[in-house]
Amino acid sequence: MRHKHGYRKLGRVSEHRQALLRNLACDLIENGRIETTVPKAKELRKYVEKLITKSKNADLNTHRYVYSKLGSNERAKAATRKVIEEIAPKFENRKGGYTRIIKTRFRRGDAAEMCIIEFVGE
């Protein structure tokens, strides 16, 4: 039984799952929209929306928190800057629901359900 289980394992061990979410989050922040499978998109939505909610209060601790969640490299540094300076102010009056998931197709090869995840208002 999976009662009260809070996240999807996505067929990966914990470090691999965290790396996947960091990379997907950086891609989404850089591009505004990405195509991925539905379970990955649903996990990514939780991950990114927490970052945006935290980023609304733009102080040094917020910068450090977001940077730690996105990894510690130049790509994460640019994504952190974009979240805090561009994306979070755009959603300042919204209390949640910063992303939308649009189901698109079934992937040829393994028939995985694909979707586009994007920020609302783009």
UniProtKB/Swiss-Prot annotation:
GO function terms (MF aspect): structural constituent of ribosome
Matches recorded under PROSITE patterns: RIBOSOMAL_L17 (PS01167)
One Pfam family in the UniProt entry: Ribosomal_L17
UniProt keyword Ribonucleoprotein, yes or no: yes
GO biological process, one term: translation
Disulfide-linked positions: none
Gene3D superfamilies: Ribosomal protein L17 (3.90.1030.10)
Keyword Ribonucleoprotein: yes
One Gene Ontology cellular component annotation held by this UniProt entry: cytosolic large ribosomal subunit
UniProt keywords, alphabetically: Ribonucleoprotein, Ribosomal protein
Highest rank taxon of the organism: Bacteria
NCBIfam families: L17
Subunit structure: Part of the 50S ribosomal subunit. Contacts protein L32.
Record-stated family: Belongs to the bacterial ribosomal protein bL17 family.
Protein name from the UniProt record: Large ribosomal subunit protein bL17
The species this protein was found in: Nautilia profundicola (strain ATCC BAA-1463 / DSM 18972 / AmH)
Taxonomy of the source species: Bacteria, Pseudomonadati, Campylobacterota, Epsilonproteobacteria, Nautiliales
